[in-house]
Amino acid sequence: MKKRNAVISLIIMAALVAGLCYTAIVGLGADKSGSISKIHLGLDLAGGVSITYQAVGETAPSSEDMADTVYKLQKRVDQYSTEAQVYREGDDRVNIEIPGVSDANQILADLGRPGSLYFIRETDDDGNPNYGYMVTEEGSLGYGLTRTIEELDATGDIVLSGTDVANATAGYQSDSMNNRQIVVELVFTDEGGKKFAEATKRAYDQGETIGIYYDGGFISVPRVQSPITNGQAIITGEESIESAQNLASTIRIGGLKVELEELRSNVVGAQLGQTAIQTSLRAGIIGLALVMVFMIAIYFIPGLTASIALVIYTMLMIIILNAFDVTLTLPGIAGILLSIGMAVDANVIIFARIREELKTGASVQNATDTGYQKALSAIIDGNVTTLITAFVLMWLGTGSVKGFAQTLAIGILLSMLTALFITKFLMKIFYGIGFQDKKWYISSKALAEKKVEPIDFTGRKKIFFGISIAVILAGFIAMGVRGASGQGALNYSLDFVGGTSTDVTFNQDYSLTELEQQVVPVFESVTGDSNVQLQKVAGSNEVIIKTRTLELAERQELTQKLSEQFGIDESSIQAETISSTISSEMRRSTMIAVILALALVLLYIWLRFKDIRFGASSVIALAHDVLVTLTCYAILRVSVGSTFIACMLTIVGYSVNATIVIFDRIRENMQMRKPGEKMDDLVNMSVTQTLSRSLFTSLTTFIMVFILYIFGVASIRVFALPIMVGIVAGAYSSVCISGSLWLVLRGWFPPKHDDSGARPKQNKLKAKTDEEKRRLQEKRVWDKTLV
């Protein structure tokens, strides 16, 4: 690229970056489209309530009944928030999410009461109106009650209820003039038909209406044209078939016999959500800045281009979250910050390759092109395997775990875009501007190191294997001791055992003794149970208290007592309840997800490397990383909750990335293997050549997660700590174990032919003389002996 073109390209790129930053931070237009403030926040960030119901009864509900139930609940939650969502899960479950509400406990109470449908007489026996056209409580004109439902019921002015309606359907019918009209047809039960006959006779005689009242408001007030004695009625006058269908559905759901049981509920105070956002943003900014400083300090101009690409990556992530309306949760933020650390991985692989080429005497331009070419396969393989784990999470995960998987998958795809295209384009721009000397790409000391002395990793494999076995055994011993003492092998959260967890942020930092003396008695007085578990969150006033499953009334009483005795705002109290049904499903999903991810990774590596030994070695190394992380959970008593599956699969995806880079180098070096070179030496050289990549990538990702752990809220720390352990375990297994494992398996199951993964290119030149034929034949024979 010529200097003039490079300068123009740099100006365009600067304008592009500025535009992306403006869009992501400020937004476009009056509605600020694309800005970070417009991202749809999950309940753990926006505050609110979520609840999962399951239909119970002797017979399974029909699909129509469940659809009506969803419609019924959606109508009820719309009054709380325009962003409220109600959706089915499977055949018999309904999920409700209502963000940004203040009195979440009251909403839970309202949702717990079934919506009632009533048919009400227009006047009582004395001629007083039971309802009329008036200004409603919402300030609009419409029909409203003059007396309460209880008063109407006591005087007998409620003539039918929802259970008296057998069915309601919308359709078309011809009137007496043969005109097609929209109607709602009602069919009553036998008892309901008798009641309706009496009510319509009275209404017809007095020229009155019968109001149909549902869940706090009138849905229709039809005038009675004649006594209806056949148990069927027609309502006319609807403006559209859609409005008729809505009316029919509302009448049907008013008489639903579907009984709903609460499986899970979560109440998050708005203040807790705001704190989580602020701390996570702070962690992201600090972590990103540290990674950028590290990259520039280590890699000079390439590090600068990677830093610019990281800024572009971050801004694009914000814009994409807006464009696809992805709901951002706390684990989702963790996924973004983790993917920022992982985005550095591709750049580190490329820059390490570029430096290797520079050491051979190649020019900066040639070294850059060759570096990108040689790094491509490792980058693709590593990112595909990480995507596999993300897709498994999206498939088997629920709620916040699925949000984590979505942001992680988006981050992986964006990281490939920025590393393979944007960073390379920036490298060409800086080269064209004038940064053509090798000193801008590699230190003189590193450039002088022409030969890399291999480290004998395989010779120390017994030591490395022994360390790993000892750590894993320590974890199993800890689980056994804890289990025998009745504490539980692992510190299972509600997601795995069920119960109620109350997260309280006090106005001061109480000691554990003070909590046991002052707070525990409050919980015991409400629960009537002495089994109350306390967990202080280090560095904050936050305390997590676990109890048996609490009913809604008990949760409300507990919130009131905590607020009165400790002066806590209700927005600082978060409660979550999970049934044993959900917890057993969570345990099963976790096992399936981990096993499925390992199997898919094994299959991909086997197909990609055409060597089952590479795949088996990778899976064993991944199992090692998972078990070491499990040791962390066992010894440090880290809470095993809904993010456990996300944590384990993240470690699987991240660790296999590092292992693939080493295996890719082994495969490459086998194609250039020298006569008589021992396989141990080849493996040691391959691991040594990729050592800087393994260490630098692990360090940058560790920095991001460590900052997240330092500044994050409790739920983020529970996720970040095992991830840090997994990063260290993954780096250790990739460098110290994976190559030796492959070597051991190769010894146990020796190849029958050249299994390097790719054969050397054959010389396609035609020999013109006998001497040339002989030399060419010798070369082909020599190529075939490189096993």
Which ranges hold each PLM region?
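A structural signal for conserved, well-ordered secondary-structure elements
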Residues: 1-787
